[in-house]
Amino acid sequence: MIYVCVPAHNESRTIGVLLWKVRKVLGEFDRPYRVVVHEDGSTDDTAEVLARYSRSLPLTVLRSDEQLGYAASVDRLLRYVVNDAPYPKRDCAVVLQGDFTEDPQDLVGLVKVLEGGADIVAGCATDSSGPVPRSVRLIGRLSRLALGKVLDDSPVSDPLNGFRAYRVIVLKKAFRDRPESEPLVSSEGWAANLELLGALAPHARRIGEAPLDRRYEFRARPSRLRAWRTLRALARLRGESWWSELDVGAA
């Protein structure tokens, strides 16, 4: 089972077309799947759009009355998968943004690498990706200064990118004996993606990568990325030693 996990806050303009594309891609891929969306206290029509699509694809919607934020949304989604997945050694969860900047077509590449033996598969943007906003380029350059060896020693080339596939057994081990009051991740945004990889990588035997396209031009709302807030969050992770004793193979 492929669980496509989508954190969504005020994504009514893109969540419908995203779900339609996921259904098309995974229907052709011919693997069982379920889309799990955390509707994070949206104030637009996101909930109404999700209700319409619940009749046309396997969809589970988790809801919070107030906005919890990206990290808490991802935590809830992954906990749901751990509790629902019938075959944790075979099933996987893929985290996909609700703003359509990540192409659902790339789900196939991630899952194929995982089926080849990897326990975590990280998306790696290709040179063919669309134009990158100036703020994203700036943070990408400055993040190396903010993170130092945490970035240099990472087991994947882009640990700030959250488009990844995780074998459920890895999630299960990470969440073991960890109540909901103790989330895996406390940062937000790009820092949350890095922190999540740091929490899960020690439980993986093999970590791989798959190419993907980033399509910032498809976002139908203003970017929520704030350069200095993101850099401050990344700088707080500079002293982490996630990779110091990591012993995983490449996939």
Please annotate each region the language model reported.
Residues 39-48, 100:
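A conserved acidic beta->alpha catalytic loop
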Residues 1-2, 20, 28, 53, ...:
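Hydrophobic helical membrane-anchoring modules
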Residues 11-26:
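Short, well-formed alpha-helical segments that are part of the catalytic scaffolds
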Residues 26-31, 54-58, 86:
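Short helix-capping segments at alpha-helix termini
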Residues 60-81, 90-92, 103-183, 217-225:
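Acceptor/aglycone-binding surface of glycosyltransferases and processive sugar-polymer synthases
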Residues 31-41, 62-64:
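Short beta-strand/loop segment that forms part of the nucleotide-sugar
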